[in-house]
Amino acid sequence: GLPVCGETCVGGTCNTPGCTCSWPVCTRD
């Protein structure tokens, strides 16, 4: 739930391991 992945996922996917897409940013926990 924290936007600490430093990645956006406007396309719907995250490349960073352990991160999920909470549009439009990738989040972890």
Swiss-Prot record:
There is a cross-link at residues 1-29 (Cyclopeptide (Gly-Asp)). PROSITE patterns: CYCLOTIDE (PS51052), CYCLOTIDE_MOEBIUS (PS60009). Pfam families: Cyclotide. This is a cyclic peptide. It comes from the Eukaryota. Keywords: Disulfide bond, Knottin, Plant defense. One of its GO terms (biological process) is defense response. Disulfide bonds join 5-19, 9-21, 14-26. Belongs to the cyclotide family. Moebius subfamily. The presence of a 'disulfide through disulfide knot' structurally defines this protein as a knottin. Probably participates in a plant defense mechanism. This is Kalata-B4.
